């Protein structure tokens, strides 16, 4: 047998000498006063703690079941900065394991996606089956002992890549490294009805239309996650003027576009998840997706069937919904773009894979969703570029010393009389409040400062 079993290896705690105490981390976010310390977006030591305490303990979106329909189909992606392989197994289940050879650490798969019977390290040829078992080591007998027969003291079963927990929710595949973390549905909790607005409109569920895209943005991952979690405010003010203008017919100008002031947002009771939407005003959805998708999503037989199926939610009154499942799963129901944010240090994030998640039918609607997503929310999309430009400029400013010396304001809604909306489940607030943002950062601070699930669990 090897020195450690796989179970022992996965249980080894990684500890580092830190300059940030748990108490100091908690002080970075004050949800009661609505204050955020800007160092959370730019500090390298905080980022290293994020990799350990957030990305190694949270349920992270990796893809859709439609990405890997057949045995041996795989997709390579990331959990934090750890490269992983997601593979469909012979029994139909899904495994996720570290994309790392246990010999010298080389990736065992260098393609983005495909179908394989095995994964072979290109450095020394160690080979692993689709379940992650080490099955072949070149010159094994010669390299590990001089016996021609018998036990060499090297057991291949000890040297498979680290395995993650895998669970799915209505087509979405999530993984988690932490054996002590709550199960996925407990983790999602009261956010599930808001996810269902996109994922559960029909009995057939959703599929993936078109390919996947990936791109890198030089900004901290939390700017992107927070915007999808809580920030309808930017869409109704300045950020998307160019995107909206490009969508208008020639006879209209921006003076004729009025964004709604009526809407709500949701803050999860636990977990940092959040969502927001306008009520009974389709202007934003029309500006992004055009009349065909807006009508399909809000009127007619498909919308009526969805409303009956999702009777917990008044879906036909919800427009322009945005959502983040903490930390990095973000999507836009009605626009139907969905993506993960993969951190690349404190100053960079990779968006992807990003894809369009669509109802199973009809075909013309799927094609219209695909076409409009290409135009608006992808690497070259008008709205995507509007968002990215703002995040990048914020990050550039945070290179300075004084830019990180004063707290940022997250006080919208703090001094406003309670505007919870009883028509929607869970804790809700006014659409232009920052209740969901305060919830996200409060949970961020808890995960960063509470290493034990006994205190952190729901």
From Swiss-Prot:
Heterohexamer consisting of 3 BphA1 subunits and 3 BphA2 subunits. A ferredoxin (BphA3) and a ferredoxin reductase (BphA4) must be present to obtain activity. It comes from the Bacteria. Residues 59-157 form the Rieske domain. The gene is bphA1. Binds 1 [2Fe-2S] cluster per subunit. Gene3D superfamilies: Naphthalene 1,2-dioxygenase Alpha Subunit, Chain A, domain 1 (3.90.380.10), Rieske [2Fe-2S] iron-sulphur domain (2.102.10.10). One of its GO terms (biological process) is catabolic process. GO terms for molecular function: 2 iron, 2 sulfur cluster binding; biphenyl 2,3-dioxygenase activity; iron ion binding. It comes from Pseudomonas sp. (strain KKS102). This is Biphenyl dioxygenase subunit alpha.
């Amino acid at each position: 047998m090897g020195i450690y079993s796989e179970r022992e290896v996965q249980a080894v705690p990684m500890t580092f000498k830190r300059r940030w105490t748990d108490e100091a981390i908690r002080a970075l976010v004050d949800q009661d006063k609505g204050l955020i310390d800007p160092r959370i977006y730019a500090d390298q030591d905080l980022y290293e703690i994020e990799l350990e305490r957030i990305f190694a303990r949270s349920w992270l979106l990796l893809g859709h079941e439609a990405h890997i329909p057949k045995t041996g189909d795989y997709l390579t992606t990331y959990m934090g900065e750890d490269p992983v392989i997601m593979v469909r197994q012979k029994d139909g289940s899904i495994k996720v394991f570290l994309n790392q050879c246990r010999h010298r650490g080389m990736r065992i798969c260098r393609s983005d996606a495909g179908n394989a019977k095995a994964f072979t390290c290109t450095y020394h040829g160690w080979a692993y089956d689709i379940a992650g078992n080490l099955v072949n080591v070149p010159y094994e007998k010669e390299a590990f002992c001089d016996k021609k027969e018998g036990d060499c003291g090297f057991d291949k079963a000890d040297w498979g890549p680290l395995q993650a927990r895998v669970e799915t929710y209505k087509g979405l595949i999530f993984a988690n490294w932490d054996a002590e973390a709550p199960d996925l549905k407990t983790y999602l909790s009261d956010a599930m009805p808001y996810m269902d607005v996109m994922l559960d409109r029909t009995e057939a569920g959703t599929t993936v239309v078109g390919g996947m895209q990936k791109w890198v943005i030089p900004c901290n991952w939390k700017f992107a996650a927070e915007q999808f979690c809580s920030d309808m405010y930017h869409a109704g003010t300045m950020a998307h003027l160019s995107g909206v203008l490009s969508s208008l017919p020639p006879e209209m100008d921006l003076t004729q576009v009025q964004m709604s002031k009526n809407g709500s947002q949701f803050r999860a009771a636990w977990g940092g998840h959040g969502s927001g939407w306008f009520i009974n005003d389709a202007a934003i959805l029309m500006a992004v997706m055009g009349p065909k998708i807006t009508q399909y999503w809000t009127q007619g037989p498909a919308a009526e069937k969805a409303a009956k199926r999702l009777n917990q939610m008044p879906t036909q009154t919800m427009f322009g919904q945005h959502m983040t499942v903490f930390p990095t799963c973000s999507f836009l129901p009605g626009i139907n773009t969905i993506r993960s944010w993969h951190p690349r240090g404190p100053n960079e994030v990779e968006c992807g894979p990003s894809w369009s998640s669509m109802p199973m039918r009809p075909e013309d609607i799927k094609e219209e969703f695909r076409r409009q997503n290409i135009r608006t929310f992808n690497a070259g999309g008008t709205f995507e570029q509007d968002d990215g430009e703002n995040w990048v400029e914020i990050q550039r400013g945070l290179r300075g010393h004084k830019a990180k010396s004063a707290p940022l304001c997250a006080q919208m809604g703090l001094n406003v009389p309670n505007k919870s909306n009883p028509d929607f489940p869970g804790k809700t607030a006014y659409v232009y409040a920052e209740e969901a943002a305060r919830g996200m950062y409060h949970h961020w601070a808890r995960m960063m400062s509470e290493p034990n699930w006994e205190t952190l669990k729901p």
